[in-house]
Amino acid sequence: MGSSSIVELLEAYPIPEEKEIPPYKIYCDMDGVLTDFQKRFEHFTGMLPKAYENKYGIAGFWNLIDVEVGIKFWSDMDWMPEGKRLWNFIEKYNPDLLTSPSKDDSSRLGKKLWVKENLTPLPNVIFSY
């Protein structure tokens, strides 16, 4: 080592530097991630959502959810089997919920009620159309 300069040693054996960890934002979906959409749908129809849509069409599918059941379809959903575990893990990172409502206002209202009843502190809810 005698004749090597410090600069040469650092170039030959670079030391990884800790870099500032960039801030990340976690977005978590509701339907099928936190809430069990399929189970809720089957509760009212006895059918899988896709089978119901194939039989009654997309208009019949959304009519059942938005008109016949309404807000309660969304507000009374069960958690997905691992939904609470996921939420308990990510909540410390201040996640936002990202969800797609139906065209009817009952969906947005029902989802907001579900969040209010099930999540504390209340996360920001972003509706994506």
Language-model segments: which ranges?
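Hydrophobic, Leu/Ile/Phe/Ala-enriched alpha-helical segments that form helix-helix packing faces
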Residues: T45, I90, N118-L119
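Short, flexible, glycine/charge-rich loop motifs used to bind or transfer phosphoryl groups or to couple energy/partner
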Residues: I15-E17, R85-L86, F127-Y129
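Donor nucleotide-activated moiety binding/catalytic core segment of transferases
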Residues: N118-Y129
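A general structural motif
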Residues: I21-P23, K92-N94, L122
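Active-site neighborhood of HAD-like aspartate-dependent phosphohydrolases
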Residues: S5-E68
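Substrate-recognition element of Asp-dependent hydrolases with the DxDx(T/V) motif
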Residues: W74-D78, G83-K111, V115
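Glycine-/proline-rich flexible loop or hinge segments
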Residues: N63-F73, D96-L97
